[in-house]
Amino acid sequence: MTTDEGAKNSRENPTATVAEQGEDVTSKKDRGVLKIVKRVGHGEETPMIGDKVYVHYNGKLSNGKKFDSSHDRNEPFVFSIGKGQVIKAWDIGVATMKKGEICHLLCKPEYAYGATGSLPKIPSNATLFFEIELLDFKGEDLLEDGGIIRRTKRRGEGYSNPNEGARVQIHLEGRCGGRVFDCRDVAFTVGEGEDHDIPIGIDKALEKMQREEQCILHLGPRYGFGEAGKPKFGIEPNAELIYEVTLKSFEKAKESWEMDTKEKLEQAAIVKEKGTLYFKGGKYVQAVIQYGKIVSWLEMEYGLSEKESKASESFLLAAFLNLAMCYLKLREYTKAVECCDKALGLDSANEKGLYRRGEAQLLMNEFESAKGDFEKVLEVNPQNKAARLQIFMCQKKAKEHNERDRRIYANMFKKFAEQDAKEEANKAMSKKTSEGVTNEKLAVSHAVEEEKPEGHV
């Protein structure tokens, strides 16, 4: 067969071509998924487990009959690699592709829809042919805020994950700007990585990993070393970091339901102290984790003795007030208000709770509500000079805000008035022009009438 004949045969019967020439991309090498690259992609990276991929495809039965196409819907198909969202052949085949690549896949039934099929379009035990174009892929957004992107190099074992307070052993390698700044084995408690110069993003990611999982983590500044940077490692403020992490082993911390009240109160005292140390060091996210443990342990605790109840209420009040302060520092004002509300639910006249809620509401431009809270602070403690100053700030900010609104609305109304005047002028001009044309036509008409002969032939 000549080259031209081979190309013609490939176009006319691509299924046969893949069957004859396709590369076996299965781990078992059982020829269950065969692949031919039709257009080479760019770069060296291929999708990893958990990556979100964007593809266009055409799907045909082995007889050439089309059963599905993303092109017909005019939108790419999106799925996550290795999560069982698509047939096995796709999880295997698409994971071998580079961005921009177009390939042909031939998929045996055991890697497609098997004996069940997918009626009415795909019969039982059907071998399927796909043409797939990999448009793009990106890592898994762990917290759905873009701050931690995970790309899984090796799947972990089992289904259990470390929890907050779990003892973990990991290997990590940290990079910044292509430079390796940290590489070691380390054991620590999840939520306390900062004590070992490990950024909070690693703690957060570990709660979603399985034993022996190996992944690459892209950390934004919020989940890295933040505004402070890390001089010890030569990390500048607000740096983007890349870590490769392997979770070697872990021992889970006790869950709330596994602890009795006495143990919860003992642990509350310990984590309160840890939270305060983190707060004083400017590690507000880490402090939130510690204070949050107190809430998770004690907020829904019932059947306590009078002594236990007083201790629990004291810990909860301190936790909510401290959480509010952390959220103020983190500029998460809505959460700060919520924590103050809970603190004031325990002690309605709490000076710190009222003041911090007022601060949060002032920063949210809720001037009247903020002023009301600061006035309540003065009712509790008339000597609170800071609250008196904040009332003045509320009045000043409210006045500035109202004046700014008036200017904005005045400018808007001025523009509307100018626009209306312009439209009226255009209408008047149009009317005048129209009347002029009409008068001119009438004059011409009269002139023609005057020139007409008196009689007809």
UniProtKB/Swiss-Prot annotation:
Record PTM N-acetylmethionine, positions in chain: 1
Sites of Phosphoserine modification: 445
Activity regulation as described: Inhibited by both FK506 and rapamycin.
Keywords: Acetylation, Chaperone, Cytoplasm, Isomerase, Nucleus, Phosphoprotein, Repeat, Rotamase, TPR repeat, Ubl conjugation
EC number: 5.2.1.8
Cross-referenced SMART domains: TPR (SM00028)
Coiled coil: none
UniProt-recorded Gene Ontology molecular function terms: heat shock protein binding; peptidyl-prolyl cis-trans isomerase activity; protein-macromolecule adaptor activity
Stretches for region Disordered: 1-27, 423-457
PPIase FKBP-type domain span: 50-138, 165-251
Additional note from the record: The relative resistance of New World monkeys to glucocorticoids is associated with a high level of expression of FKBP5, but is also due to intrinsic differences between the human and the monkey proteins. Human FKBP5 has a much lower effect on glucocorticoid sensitivity.
UniProt cross-references to PANTHER family, sorted A to Z: PEPTIDYLPROLYL ISOMERASE (PTHR46512:SF9)
Free-text function comment from the UniProt entry: Immunophilin protein with PPIase and co-chaperone activities. Component of unligated steroid receptors heterocomplexes through interaction with heat-shock protein 90 (HSP90). Plays a role in the intracellular trafficking of heterooligomeric forms of steroid hormone receptors maintaining the complex into the cytoplasm when unliganded. Acts as a regulator of Akt/AKT1 activity by promoting the interaction between Akt/AKT1 and PHLPP1, thereby enhancing dephosphorylation and subsequent activation of Akt/AKT1.
Protein name according to UniProt: Peptidyl-prolyl cis-trans isomerase FKBP5
Name of the coding gene: FKBP5
